[in-house]
Amino acid sequence: MLYRLIVFDLDETLWTIRQTNMQPVKGPFRLVNSHEAVGQGSTVTLFRGVRTLLRNLERRDKFVSLASRSDPDVCEELLRLFGVHHCFLHPQFGWQEKSTAVTNVLKAFRDIGKEHITPQEVLFIDDWPANVEAVRGIGAATLLFGRDIRSIQELAVILE
C-alpha cells in the first residue's frame, strides 16, 4: 500500500522521557545536545534517526503529522528545540482519542483544500496497543512501536 500520510505518536515513539519526579512533564527546556533536552524534573531524548527519517519522507513527498496525548505547549517547545517542528502538518495534541486525532488531521487537509487523503492512505505509529487498535478501526494501517517495529531505523527500512 502506498501511504501518503504518516502519523506519529511522540512519547516512546519519536522520543523517550525520563522523569526524576512524579510531576507532569513541563518546560522550559534547554538543549543539552542535539538529541536531548532537560526540563523541570524530566529529560526528553529524541530517538536517533528521527531527523533522517523525516527528511527522507519529505523528499519522497509524504505528508507527516502527529497525534499525541501530551501538553501542546510542551510538545511545541520540544519539537522546536529539536528542530523538527516544521516537518509536521496539522499536528494534534491533547487528550482526545487517537482515532479522533487522526480523523482531525484528515479533516484539516480537506478543509484547506490541499489534499483529500483517505484513512486507507494513512500509516499510524504508536507505542500503545489500544491507540493502534482504535486507529486501525477507522481504516488506517498501523504499527505498534516496540512490537511491530523496534527502532526508527527499522521503520525507515519499511517505509523505503
Residue ranges and their predicted role:
Residues Q19, C75-L78, V132-R136:
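A short acidic (Asp/Glu
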Residues M1-R55, R59:
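Active-site neighborhood of HAD-like aspartate-dependent phosphohydrolases
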Residues Q19-M22, R55-K62, I112-I117, A130:
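Preference for well-ordered, secondary-structure-rich cores of eukaryotic proteins
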Residues M1-I6, F29, T45, H86-L89, ...:
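Asp-based, Mg2+/Mn2+-dependent phosphohydrolase catalytic module
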Residues F82:
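Histidine/lysine/aspartate-rich catalytic loop segments that bind and position anionic ligands
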Residues R18, Q92-W95, G146:
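Residues at the C-termini of beta-strands that transition into short coil/loop
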